[in-house]
Amino acid sequence: MSGHSKWATTKHKKAIIDSRRAKSFAKLIKNIEVAARMGGPDLAGNPGLELAVTKAKKTSVPNDNIDRAIKRGAGLTGEVVDYTEIMYEARGPQGSALLIECLTDNKNRAASEVRLAISRNGGTIADPGSVSYLFNRKGVVNLPKNGLGEDDVLMAVLDAGAEEVKDNGESFEIHSEPGDLPAIREALKDAGIEYDTDEVEFVPSMQVELDVDGARKFMKLADALEELDDVQNVYSNADFSDEVQAALESE
């Protein structure tokens, strides 16, 4: 979902469009509950919760829903929030690799549904570690260009810990260590620069370019996985050219 990937750019646009869907809201709420359970209800002392809440607010989750999720997760309502994080690894078309991040209250259900979605859509489950080494955990901020140059963005965020700024065509993507993400957001705010999304993601060290057929199959696989309630995120090293993107959009 990162780098100069056409899939990444499409995904971030899709995330904004889909932000009002109930499924998207449920996943954001689940993130908040887990972060509050792990680190407590205080945003100032819980960076994971602060990130989860910021993301939820950015995608228009109502404040009441957010507050209730924090209280549930922190155990202030008497409800038990018991989710397990699981990462599955898979191979897709033409040598592409996928990491499937799950948050579930039923490990058997998650395993069954993920495996079924992969096998039905042309992928194969990979052994633990055989795919994950291709990715690094990074803070990733996506922002529209709005007339900005790459140097403008870099100057705004360099002292906040930014490692690089990538040009994705219509947008820029800032990479940092996960812990520097709040400082990056604050630096952008101070510079008057608006951003679309900020995430902690698994970023591929190298990308695999797919042709039209491979990209079509890959999108089918990725979409099937993301439709699953237990799947929070899908990361991949798949990429495709402008020509392949245009061909897919014309179908």
Curated annotation (Swiss-Prot):
- UniProt key word Zinc-finger: no
- Any one Gene Ontology molecular-function term assigned to this protein's record: DNA binding
Q: Where is the protein localized?
A: Cytoplasm
> What is a single Pfam family found in this protein's UniProt entry?
TACO1_YebC_N
For the biological process aspect of GO, one term held by this record is:
regulation of DNA-templated transcription
GO CC, alphabetical: cytosol
Keyword entries, A-Z:
Cytoplasm, DNA-binding, Transcription, Transcription regulation
Residue intervals passing through the bilayer: none
InterPro entries, per this entry?
A: Integrase-like_N, TACO1_YebC-like_2nd/3rd_dom, TACO1_YebC_N, Transcrip_reg_TACO1-like, Transcrip_reg_TACO1-like_dom3, YebC-like
Give the UniProt family note: Belongs to the TACO1 family.
NCBIfam families given for it? PRK00110.1, PRK12378.1, YebC/PmpR family DNA-binding transcriptional regulator
This one is known as Probable transcriptional regulatory protein Achl_2034
Recorded source organism is Pseudarthrobacter chlorophenolicus (strain ATCC 700700 / DSM 12829 / CIP 107037 / JCM 12360 / KCTC 9906 / NCIMB 13794 / A6)
